[in-house]
A protein has these predicted regions:
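An exposed, glycine/acidic-rich loop-and-rim segment of catalytic or binding clefts
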Residues: 16-52, 58-257
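Bacterial N-terminal signal peptides that target proteins for export
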Residues: 1-3
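C-terminal motif of bacterial Sec signal peptides marking the signal peptidase cleavage site
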Residues: 11-14
Length: 257
C-alpha cells in the first residue's frame, strides 16, 4: 500500500514545463521528447535574470548543458553532454546524471544491514558501481531511468525517482528527489532528499563533466584547479578505496595551492 501510494503521488504531481523558445545552447526540445521505459522524456530550460541557462532532461535527472558568459560576455556551454535523447538512452555514460541509489563503488557488490546480506550487481571489477548502472539487458541505476517531474518553474526543477524494494538488490522502497535551482548569483544549487520504509543505503551525486573552454573539442590542460583538501582516499588496482586516508602533499593529488 505504501509503495502504491507513493507511486500514485509521484505521477499525480508530475507536470510539464512551460512552453519556452528554444534554449540558447542550440539544443532542440523536440530531440528530447520521446517515450522511454513507458514514460515521457523532455528537455527543461532553467534561466535567471542574468541570462544564464541550464538545460535538464528527466532521463537520468541529467544536466545537459550549462550556458555561462565567458570573459568577453559570449555565452558558452561548459559541460559535456549529448544533443538528443537517443544517445542518452543507448550510449552508456554518466554525463550530467543524478546518480543513485549509491554513487561510487560498494566493495564486492555486497552490503550487510542488520545481519541481512544483500547481493548487488557487480558491474565494475567485481564491485557495484553507481547502483549497478547498465543499459542492458534492462536499464539499471537511476542515471539510466526516467524521473517524474514534480515541479518546474523558470529557474527550478524538482525530479522524483521512485525506486521499489529490491531494485538492483537494494532494500527498501525509496522516494528520492533531485532539485536543481539556478540562482541569480549564477550558482546551481542541487538538493537531494530521500525517504524509505526500510533500512538501506543512499549516496546520491551529480556526475557533470566540465570543460570550461566552451569548445568541447579542446583539452582541459589549460584549466586551473584548486581543492582545499589536505588528504585523499587512495584506491587499489580496481579503483576501490583501501580505507586509508593519506596526505596529498608530494602526490599528484595535491591541488591545494
Amino acid at each position: 500500500a505504501f509503495f502504491g501510494a507513493i507511486c500514485a503521488l509521484a505521477m499525480l504531481t508530475a507536470c510539464n514545463a512551460p512552453q519556452k523558445s528554444e534554449p540558447i545552447s542550440g539544443l532542440k526540445r523536440a530531440d528530447f521528447q520521446s517515450e522511454q521505459q513507458g514514460k515521457q522524456t523532455d528537455l527543461y530550460t532553467l534561466t535567471n535574470k542574468n541570462g544564464m541557462e541550464v538545460c535538464v532532461t528527466n532521463f537520468g535527472g541529467r544536466i545537459v548543458s550549462i550556458m555561462v558568459p565567458d570573459k568577453d560576455g559570449n555565452m558558452q556551454d561548459v559541460v559535456i553532454g549529448y544533443s538528443n535523447i537517443t544517445d542518452y538512452a543507448t550510449k552508456p555514460s554518466d554525463f550530467g546524471a543524478s546518480v543513485g541509489r549509491y554513487a561510487n563503488r560498494i566493495a564486492n557488490g555486497v552490503i550487510t544491514i542488520d545481519d541481512v546480506v544483500y547481493d548487488l550487481p557487480k558491474n565494475n571489477f567485481g564491485h557495484c558501481l553507481h547502483g549497478g548502472c547498465t543499459l542492458e539487458p534492462a536499464p539499471m541505476g537511476w542515471q539510466n531511468q526516467v524521473f517524474d517531474v514534480e515541479k518546474v518553474t523558470d529557474n527550478q526543477i524538482v525530479l522524483v525517482k521512485v525506486s521499489p524494494d529490491g531494485e538492483a538488490g537494494f532494500p527498501g522502497n525509496v522516494v528520492a528527489k533531485t532539485t536543481y535551482t539556478l540562482t541569480d548569483d549564477n550558482a546551481i544549487d542541487i538538493v537531494w532528499t530521500a525517504t524509505t520504509d526500510k533500512k538501506t543505503v543512499i549516496n546520491q551525486t551529480n556526475h557533470c563533466y566540465f570543460n570550461l573552454n566552451g569548445d568541447h573539442q579542446m583539452p582541459i590542460t589549460n584549466h586551473l584547479l584548486q581543492l582545499n583538501a589536505d588528504c585523499y582516499t587512495p584506491v587499489d588496482s580496481t579503483y576501490m578505496t583501501t580505507g586509508e586516508i593519506a596526505p596529498v602533499a608530494g602526490t599528484p593529488m595535491d591541488f591545494s595551492a
